[in-house]
């Protein structure tokens, strides 16, 4: 059955034990064959699902349920029995390499049906496969609701396509399956029992039921065919040659046939698996593995970093963290400046005048009115800063309206002289006035410049605009002179009348 190998001589290892490098592995020989791939015994005892925490019974139920879904979907899709058998064998092979916890068995079953239909040259659309599995999931005896073509359907379709690629990659594109269907008919012809239709059909049925077990990934198809014929003959009580045993002629052993028959008969005494219960168990294991993975990384289940220490240290329990800012505490500069400000300025909400702490009132000047307007701002931030005396911005506040000057009495004159602002504050007020005047003058210059520029642009477009402007200016001057002459004449007449 083997086609050959890549070494120079057939069935001889390469010289000097030099293997063939494929990827990151070194292989001594490469055989191209159409034989079924047999899983070794060491991989059967510890499957990936068992390593993830699933028990043997749960894994067996999941395998049986997945194969039943593939068989039922193939019947509804009108696939040949060979295609359904190929899908079940691929399903069994894949989950001896991957875990049921990390891969959804229903998505993998859809991908196996889709892939098997292509292998056996009877392809079906992915949409039809998804619709059939949706119908089977709703259960028998219940009203079937059609699948809505929404975002959930698109996600399922993409998952099926990705699962099909994953199966091909994991199996190394060795998805050919040699089925024992033809072998059964050939062996019965050798035994001269091919005319017994009951025996042929019973052996065929046992072979289809054996697809739910691991027999097709553990034994050769010839051994499986002999076991199915042996089991059907025992049930129907049909005698077959026993001295020597007839199956020894076809290369099968008594131990292998016995194991295949026992595993097949266990299916009929086994309780039917419940998909909801199995899905809940798989989900629990998935959550447990995710929490264990996050715990190994030092994170909580919600993804936040976990800090494990003896004293139960937490950044929030730090007594004096540099990020904790107490609003009641004030800087030493504000504590020093606060009594001075209280002594200089005591606000009166009634008349806007400034009181000293001894209760005496005097009329405030221009500088005090500016400080009062800043301190009575609506913003609490500005009020706090102006009250503490640590912030003074004169450009952002407009001066208060001037009050009418009153002639003070001699006693109040002495008080005002004593509390009169210094020369520096007076010069600062002059500086402010000069700044405001310079700003207003600069604004007027900008306006005049823009007006002249606009005129020049209009004049550049054509001389008729300049002519119109001159005529308009002359008419305005003429009208203004007329009004002035009338007003002068009116004044003169009124004088003569008087």
Curated annotation (Swiss-Prot):
GO terms for molecular function: cyclin-dependent protein serine/threonine kinase regulator activity. Residues 367-387, 427-440, 479-498 have a biased composition (Basic residues). Residues 294-498 are annotated as: Disordered. Residues 366-396 are annotated as: RS. Gene3D superfamilies: Cyclin-like (1.10.472.10). GO terms for biological process: regulation of transcription by RNA polymerase II. Residues 182-266 are annotated as: Cyclin-like 2. One of its GO terms (cellular component) is nucleus. Residues 388-402 have a biased composition (Low complexity). CDD domains: CYCLIN_CCNL1_rpt2. Residues 68-169 are annotated as: Cyclin-like 1. Pfam families: Cyclin_C (PF02984), Cyclin_N (PF00134). Residues 311-320 have a biased composition (Polar residues). Its main location: nucleus. The modification Phosphoserine is found at residues 409, 412. It comes from the Eukaryota. Involved in pre-mRNA splicing. Contains a RS region (arginine-serine dipeptide repeat) within the C-terminal domain which is the hallmark of the SR family of splicing factors. This region probably plays a role in protein-protein interactions. This is Cyclin-L1. The lineage of its organism: Eukaryota, Metazoa, Chordata, Craniata, Vertebrata. The gene is ccnl1.
């Amino acid at each position: 059955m083997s086609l050959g190998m890549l070494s120079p001589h057939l069935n001889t290892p390469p010289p000097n034990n030099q293997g063939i490098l494929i990827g990151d592995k070194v292989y001594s020989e490469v055989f191209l064959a159409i034989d079924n791939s047999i899983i070794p015994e060491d991989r059967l005892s510890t499957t990936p699902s068992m390593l993830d925490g699933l028990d043997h019974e749960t894994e067996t139920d999941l395998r049986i349920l997945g194969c039943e879904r593939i068989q039922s979907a193939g019947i509804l899709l009108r696939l040949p029995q060979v295609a359904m058998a190929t899908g079940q064998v691929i399903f069994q092979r894949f989950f001896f390499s991957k875990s049921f916890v990390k891969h959804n068995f229903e998505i993998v079953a859809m991908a196996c049906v889709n892939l098997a239909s292509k292998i056996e040259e009877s392809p079906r659309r992915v949409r039809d496969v998804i619709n059939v599995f949706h119908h089977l999931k709703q259960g028998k005896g219940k009203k079937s609701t059609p699948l809505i073509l929404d975002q959930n359907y698109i996600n399922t379709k993409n998952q099926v396509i990705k699962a099909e690629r994953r199966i091909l990659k994991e199996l190394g594109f060795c998805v050919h399956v040699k089925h024992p269907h033809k072998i059964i008919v050939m062996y019965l012809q050798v035994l001269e029992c091919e005319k017994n239709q009951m025996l042929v059909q019973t052996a065929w049925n046992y072979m289809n039921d054996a697809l739910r077990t691991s027999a097709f990934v553990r034994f050769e198809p010839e051994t499986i065919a002999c076991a199915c014929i042996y089991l059907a003959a025992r049930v129907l009580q049909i005698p077959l040659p026993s001295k020597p045993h007839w199956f020894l002629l076809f290369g099968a052993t008594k131990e292998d046939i016995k194991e295949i028959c026992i595993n097949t008969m266990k299916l009929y005494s086994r309780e039917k698996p419940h998909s909801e219960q199995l899905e809940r168990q798989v989900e629990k294991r998935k959550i447990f593995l995710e929490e264990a993975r996050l715990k190994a990384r030092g994170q909580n289940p919600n993804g936040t970093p976990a800090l494990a220490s003896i004293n139960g240290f937490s950044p929030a329990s730090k007594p004096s963290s540099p990020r904790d800012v107490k609003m009641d505490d004030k800087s030493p500069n504000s504590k020093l400046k606060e009594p001075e400000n209280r002594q200089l300025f005591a606000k009166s909400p009634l008349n806007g005048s400034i009181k000293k702490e001894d209760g005496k009132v005097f009329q405030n000047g221009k500088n005090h009115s500016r400080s009062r307007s800043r301190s009575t701002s609506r913003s609490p931030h500005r009020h706090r800063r102006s009250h503490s005396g640590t912030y003074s911005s004169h450009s952002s506040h407009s001066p208060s309206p001037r009050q009418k000057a009153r002639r003070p009495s001699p006693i109040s004159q002495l008080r005002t002289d004593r509390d009169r602002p210094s020369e520096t504050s007076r010069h600062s007020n002059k500086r402010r006035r000069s700044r405001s005047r310079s700003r207003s003058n600069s604004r007027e210059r900008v306006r005049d410049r823009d007006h002249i520029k606009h005129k020049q642009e209009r004049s550049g477009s054509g001389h008729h605009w300049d002519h119109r402007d001159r005529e308009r200016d002359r008419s305005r001057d003429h009208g203004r002179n007329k009004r002035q002459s009338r007003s002068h004449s009116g004044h003169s007449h009124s004088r003569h009348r008087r």
